[in-house]
Amino acid sequence: MNDVWDELQWRGLVAHSTDEAALQEALQTGPLTYYVGFDPTAASLHVGHLVQVLTAKRLQQAGHRPLILVGGATGLVGDPRPSAERTMNDPSVVAGWVTGLQGQIAPFLDFDGPAAATMVNNLDWTQSMSTIEFLRDVGKHFSVNRMLDREAVSKRLATTGISFTEFSYVLLQSNDYLQLHRRHGCTLQLGGSDQWGNITAGCELVRRVDQRTVHALATPLLTKADGTKFGKTESGAVWLDPELTSPYAFHQFWLNAEDAKVVDYLKAFSFRPREEIEELGRQAVENPRARAAQRALAHEVTALVHGEEAAVAVEAAAAALFGGSDLEAIDERILRGALAELPTAAPADRDVRLAQLFADTGLAPSLSGARRTIGEGGAYVNNIKLTDPEATLRDVQLLHGRYAVLRRGKKSLASVAVPLPQ
């Protein structure tokens, strides 16, 4: 087997593990079967989930067999948060999310060959258990004292309190490991470091019930340079679903990675070899303005999630927006996603003066300021220099019949979207 342990260590993907020597030996002598779980708490995964998805992919590439669990049962309960109780979602909604998340994860893995991946749903074994079976076969092996010591539980007890439903979540997740060990020979659980308590509880349940030693590996929770949570922008989470976060916005998120963190992100999210990442790291130090590391990161992750064609298209769109190529060549869906990230005016008709639109979108401080920018030669509409301060939107060849890109100078952008006819 490939020495995937050293690779995971170098990439900074090991925050915690059970007995390191035993796990390393199991990985080297494998193949072993491992699982990673995702709860369907929304219609899409976000970029934070990619750490688990891509780590699962790395293990599969090393010859190990992945089980991908999307929790149709645990998603109905909810892992306790330190702050407040989770919203209980309708079972039909959760079932739809299970299907959606399975579809998002599947393209990252191989479902054929000796290390073929398998999708599993914990509702399959949880819904058939009676309450008596659950309490005797699972609950009997858990100490309430230890459950009360869990950080999320203790914080909730000190503030808003916690329901028995969420308090019992750890039993459900632990039973997943037991069931997957029995049904599929699973001997490794992969998860985020925030799940470490749940993961090790599953290891302990397997040891108590089946008298077998199994393994656990937790990846770190990535952060920004200031220590805040990775994967959030001012507009919210960065989703994998292109309808929730456009491919353009997705690419921009990675392109804006901080210099201090870009190498960490390349290690975690890229499949480039060590030599290439180290070279990109050197370039980031020696010539940070070129942003070569960020460009490499943005292209690769966008291609992984949305496909190579989309990655190339959004890069072409970015170049066109700043005057580097033809705006008319941009696909409408990509253009719409790009313009959604800009200040936008939606005039009721096309008789409005372009100078007014520069003021309305904030590219100029006022109408007089917009006229001054036009007079100085610093105003562009669809990459064509605007020379007439009295020109209206009717004088513009709209992109895809309804869009215009306004630019002041080299970098300040805004958009115009003419409403569709009713």
From Swiss-Prot:
Key words of the record: Aminoacyl-tRNA synthetase, ATP-binding, Cytoplasm, Ligase, Nucleotide-binding, Protein biosynthesis, RNA-binding
Motif ('HIGH' region): 40-49
One GO CC term, this protein: cytosol
Record motif 'KMSKS' region, residues: 229-233
Positions that bind L-tyrosine: Y35, Y169, Q173
Molecular function GO terms recorded: ATP binding; RNA binding; tyrosine-tRNA ligase activity
Entry EC no(s): 6.1.1.1
Compartment(s) where it occurs, according to its Swiss-Prot or TrEMBL record: Cytoplasm
Domain (S4 RNA-binding) ranges: 352-418
One GO term of the biological process aspect: tyrosyl-tRNA aminoacylation
Main subcellular location: cytoplasm
Reactions this protein catalyses: tRNA(Tyr) + L-tyrosine + ATP = L-tyrosyl-tRNA(Tyr) + AMP + diphosphate + H(+)
Binding locations of ATP: K232
CDD domains in alphabetical order: S4, TyrRS_core
InterPro entries in the record: aa-tRNA-synth_I_CS, aa-tRNA-synth_Ic, Rossmann-like_a/b/a_fold, S4_RNA-bd_sf, SYY-like_C, Tyr-tRNA-ligase, Tyr-tRNA-ligase_bac-type, Tyr-tRNA-ligase_bac_1
Its job: Catalyzes the attachment of tyrosine to tRNA(Tyr) in a two-step reaction: tyrosine is first activated by ATP to form Tyr-AMP and then transferred to the acceptor end of tRNA(Tyr).
Self-association state and partner proteins as the record states: Homodimer.
Similarity section: Belongs to the class-I aminoacyl-tRNA synthetase family. TyrS type 1 subfamily.
Protein name as catalogued: Tyrosine--tRNA ligase
